[in-house]
């Protein structure tokens, strides 16, 4: 794409388009895409141009090194795609871009430029070549060098806020430069006075979509697999070596990820990752998944960079991030933030993002993680800057942008209200721990268990206060549960890659619908696992959000049922294992039920014989 490559299209534009058009008396609006990142902002505003009088077109400048993913994205949008060379020779009524780069000044029509992040905050050198490639992130041979008479490094220009990016031959490239806040206008006037008259304050459509979706936070949490008492931690990284994902600074993430899954109880915390599209499409989705494979087996959900990241921010209890726009959006929503990477190089020191990076709390990788996360949540006070400076017209970007677009096109606006698409409800993505779990339990009475599960800890996790540790295998005396020791067992998903861990597990589990023809009935699968794995004491088939079937080595088969929002049924099964190990008879659990304390919540679990013809009265298991 770009570079003029590709056959020129013949309809609905081209020399003979009039012969082939079905609707030719329309105004042409060209969407100018640089990469997937900039395209996301154009997707935000597409609903404002749904009009019988408008023909949408798209093109890609080819100026960004991040070209992967663009053809697929434009194909999904489903509008005619012009090669860049044809786009520059096609008269349009309006061109809309969300970045600078390529020969934008050669577009044959009026040009509106949006920001593809939270305003303009980063410095970036322009290349020597005749075209601009703002996404390249590389310095030209002379950029940043000391000149003989200067004696000091010349700072790079601020991307989107400097003559180098905004002017050609002293004239503004854009007819309208959309800003979201007067703070940006003040910096623009100071940095590039000739372009100031093109500025239009029209808000932030991306942020407005998030604000509009705030009432649906609980739905988003359920969609992302959050259960009662569980907290969602979002790991967010922009691109470049100084980012949280990058290896140009402390290279924190490779060591942080196993600590997060090993130190945070799996039922107390849900982990998701939101990575910049330039990470995905620069290194390749397959490579990104490979780098994060171990963490994903430990329960990390890796979100598509286009689909659900905003819903994740709305659902989050905490974001661990860096100097990118997504982390700033999280702070603007009032979500607690800890910075895992906080570089100031490359940021405009006068920008709100730079001020946020200077003042936001940091994650200390040398200290235990869980206390830091819990303090960040409990002691959180929203940052005023992000909330106030992201947009000066919250909820109004749709109306303001549509008015601007139609003024530039030269058409009266449609009579219907200007509306952005609501954020969709994500697909249900429950956590999957396809790894071994270290399970710590303490019996509070014969039918009540306190429980914590840790994914692949490299050391015995520090005991939370709720699980005071006593001498292994001993009781501190008193009634059941009074000073009872913390006991440990291993639970493993059947698909755990480490087959030795599966072979040694006390509890083996899997998640699948009860009618999965590949596995057979849940009770039969449980019997098969026990026959194949002599070390296993309990097999667990999780068939629904609140239901599992378990079978003991002596053949007692039970169904555990709880509310769908309660803990993972595999956790309930581990609690049952603890009760049975302590001598509680299955018939007593059937009569009294099971109570599981985990994730700051108390879950009631009903225990019934899996086969109504059996009463579960056996005491051995």
Residue ranges of predicted features:
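Extended catalytic core of nucleotide-activated donor transferases of GT-like folds
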Residues: 66-131, 149-165
């Amino acid at each position: 794409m770009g570079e003029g490559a590709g056959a020129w299209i013949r309809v609905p534009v081209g020399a003979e388009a009039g012969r082939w058009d079905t609707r030719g008396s329309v105004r042409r609006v060209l969407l100018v895409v640089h990469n997937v990142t900039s395209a996301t902002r154009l997707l935000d505003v597409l609903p404002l141009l749904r009009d019988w009088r408008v023909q949408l077109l798209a093109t890609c400048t080819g100026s960004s090194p991040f070209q992967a993913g663009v053809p697929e994205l434009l194909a999904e949008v489903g509008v005619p795609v012009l090669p860049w060379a044809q786009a520059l020779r096609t008269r349009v009524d309006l061109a809309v871009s969300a970045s600078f780069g390529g020969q934008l000044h050669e577009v044959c029509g009026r040009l509106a430029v949006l920001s593809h992040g939270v305003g303009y905050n980063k410095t970036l050198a322009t290349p020597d070549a005749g075209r601009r490639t703002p996404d390249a992130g590389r310095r030209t041979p002379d950029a940043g060098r000391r000149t003989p008479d200067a004696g000091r490094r010349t700072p790079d220009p601020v991307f989107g806020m400097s003559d180098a990016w905004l002017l050609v031959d002293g004239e503004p490239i854009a007819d309208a430069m959309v800003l979201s806040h007067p703070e940006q206008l003040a910096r623009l006037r100071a940095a590039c006075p000739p372009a100031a008259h093109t500025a239009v304050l029209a808000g932030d459509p991306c942020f407005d979509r998030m604000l509009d979706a705030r009432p649906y936070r609980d739905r988003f949490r359920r969609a992302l697999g959050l259960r009662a008492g569980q907290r969602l931690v979002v790991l967010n990284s922009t691109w470049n070596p100084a980012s949280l994902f990058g290896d140009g600074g402390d290279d924190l993430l490779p060591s942080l990820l196993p600590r997060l899954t090993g130190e945070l109880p799996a039922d107390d915390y849900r982990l998701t990752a939101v990575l910049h599209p330039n990470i995905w499409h620069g290194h390749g989705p397959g490579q990104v998944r490979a780098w994060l494979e171990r963490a994903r087996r430990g329960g990390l959900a890796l979100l598509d960079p286009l689909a659900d990241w905003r819903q994740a921010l709305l659902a989050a209890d905490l974001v661990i991030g860096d100097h990118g726009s997504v982390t700033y959006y999280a702070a603007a929503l009032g979500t607690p933030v800890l910075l895992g990477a906080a570089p100031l190089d490359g940021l405009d020191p006068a920008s709100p993002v730079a001020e946020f990076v200077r003042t936001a709390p940091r994650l200390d990788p040398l200290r235990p993680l869980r206390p830091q996360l819990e303090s960040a949540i409990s002691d959180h006070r929203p940052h005023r800057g992000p909330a106030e400076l992201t947009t000066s017209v919250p909820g109004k970007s749709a109306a303001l942008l549509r008015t601007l677009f139609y003024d530039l096109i030269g058409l009266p606006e449609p009579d219907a209200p200007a509306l952005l698409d609501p954020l969709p409800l994500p697909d249900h993505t429950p956590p999957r721990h396809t790894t071994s779990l270290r399970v710590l339990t303490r019996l509070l009475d014969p039918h009540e268990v306190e429980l914590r599960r840790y994914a692949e800890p490299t050391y015995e996790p520090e005991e939370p206060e709720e699980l005071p540790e006593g001498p292994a295998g001993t009781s501190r005396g008193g009634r059941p549960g009074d000073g009872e020791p913390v006991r440990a067992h291993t639970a493993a998903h059947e698909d755990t890659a480490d087959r030795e861990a599966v072979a040694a597990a006390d509890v083996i589990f899997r998640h699948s619908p009860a009618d999965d023809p590949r596995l057979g009935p849940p009770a039969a699968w449980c019997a098969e696992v026990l026959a194949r794995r002599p070390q296993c004491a309990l097999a667990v088939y999780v068939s629904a959000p609140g239901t599992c079937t378990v079978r003991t080595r002596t053949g007692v088969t039970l169904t555990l049922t709880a509310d769908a929002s309660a803990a993972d049924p595999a956790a309930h099964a581990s609690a049952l294992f603890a009760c049975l190990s302590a001598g509680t008879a299955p018939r007593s659990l059937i009569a009294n039920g099971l109570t599981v304390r985990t994730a700051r919540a108390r879950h009631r679990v009903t225990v019934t014989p899996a086969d109504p013809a059996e009463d579960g009265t056996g005491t051995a298991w």
